[in-house]
């Protein structure tokens, strides 16, 4: 018998938010707004970095990578969610579900790697400013971006195969708005310990290590800033980190909450679990362009000039 000659449903049924099905129609309105803001805001930042010479610097190249990742995550999830909420079209084929699962986890891990690269950018800019231009060359920036994507692909490539090896015969109903590895594996009528162990390994070895090194970079940044004599210089240096810190919090705080509920929240209502997952995936792509537009005057100026030229 072949490795993948096991029972799989032809399609899954997505419940959306279990227990809140009657609210799906009015929830679709805010979700449409979030989708538009995520796509529009991040596309504007991508275009601003592309056309504005003053933004051709490492910090903004990393920001454009973050915006690309946010657009990709939004496009991988929100159309399915809106189709479920607006049209009550809940079915998704087994293979499409696998692809969506891979893309969600891939771009989430890629975003974590980009946030780590951005923390390194802030570390070099503040702790070793004289070498900033020589350390973060265009080649190094491109290599860091490709490295984040390659790490995500290599680490997550086994996930679809780990699901395909499992016989799924309990149900074809996914109590979620989209397809994720933990929810799919729980439908299996076989031992899922390998999937659970690999999922925990991925969580700790990538997201956990990224967060550790981001924290370490800010410890070193804070130590360097505190050694600066001038209070004005300290505030100026720390102000350059505010946008990145907010982006890190917007990404990791919901992720830690979701991961904790996934593994330890057996008595947490299902709708709370799904709502937290939606916040984790939908909110950062909406907040990131707003954070950087509000806190970074160079971005605001570039966007203003870009729209001014379009108007003319």
From Swiss-Prot:
GO terms for molecular function: G protein-coupled receptor activity; olfactory receptor activity. It comes from the Eukaryota. Disulfide bonds join 97-189. Residues 47-54, 121-139, 218-237, 295-312 are cytoplasmic. Keywords: Cell membrane, Disulfide bond, G-protein coupled receptor, Glycoprotein, Membrane, Olfaction, Receptor, Sensory transduction, Transducer, Transmembrane, Transmembrane helix. It is found in: Cell membrane. The chain crosses the membrane at residues 26-46, 55-75, 100-120, 140-160, 197-217, 238-258, 274-294. One of its GO terms (cellular component) is membrane. One of its GO terms (biological process) is sensory perception of smell. It is a multi-pass membrane protein. Glycans are attached at residue 5. InterPro entries: GPCR_Rhodpsn, GPCR_Rhodpsn_7TM, Olfact_rcpt, OR51/52/56-like. Its main location: membrane. Residues 1-25, 76-99, 161-196, 259-273 are extracellular. Belongs to the G-protein coupled receptor 1 family. Odorant receptor. PANTHER family: OLFACTORY RECEPTOR 51I2, OLFACTORY RECEPTOR 56B1-RELATED. This is Olfactory receptor 51I2. It comes from Homo sapiens. The lineage of its organism: Eukaryota, Metazoa, Chordata, Craniata, Vertebrata. The gene is OR51I2.
């Amino acid at each position: 018998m072949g490795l993948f000659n096991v029972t799989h449903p032809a399609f899954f049924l997505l419940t959306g938010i279990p227990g809140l099905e009657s609210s799906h129609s009015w929830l679709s309105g805010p979700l449409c707004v979030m989708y538009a803001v995520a796509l529009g805001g991040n596309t504007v930042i991508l275009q601003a970095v592309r056309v504005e010479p003053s933004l051709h610097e490492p910090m903004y190249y990393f920001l454009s990578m973050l915006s690309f990742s946010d657009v990709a995550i939004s496009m991988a999830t929100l159309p399915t969610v809106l189709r479920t909420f607006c049209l009550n079209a809940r079915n998704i084929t087994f293979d499409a579900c696998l692809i969506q699962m891979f893309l969600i986890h891939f771009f989430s891990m890629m975003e974590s790697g980009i946030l780590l690269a951005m923390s390194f950018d802030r570390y070099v800019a503040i702790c070793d400013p004289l070498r900033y231009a020589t350390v973060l060359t265009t080649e190094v920036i491109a290599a860091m971006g490709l490295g984040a994507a390659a790490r995500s692909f290599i680490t997550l490539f086994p996930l679809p195969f780990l699901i395909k090896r499992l016989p799924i015969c309990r149900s074809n109903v996914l109590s979620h708005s989209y397809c994720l590895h933990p929810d799919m594996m729980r439908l299996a009528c076989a031992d899922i310990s390998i999937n659970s162990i690999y999922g925990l390994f991925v969580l700790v070895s990538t997201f956990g290590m990224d967060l550790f090194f981001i924290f370490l970079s800010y410890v070193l940044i804070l130590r360097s800033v505190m050694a600066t004599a001038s209070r004005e210089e300290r505030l100026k240096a720390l102000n350059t980190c505010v946008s990145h810190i907010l982006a890190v919090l917007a990404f990791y705080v919901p992720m830690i909450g979701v991961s904790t509920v996934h593994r330890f929240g057996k008595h947490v209502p299902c709708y709370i679990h799904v709502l937290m997952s939606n916040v984790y995936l939908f909110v950062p792509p909406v907040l990131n362009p707003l954070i950087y537009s509000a806190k970074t005057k160079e971005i605001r100026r570039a966007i203003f000039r870009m729209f001014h030229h379009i108007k003319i």
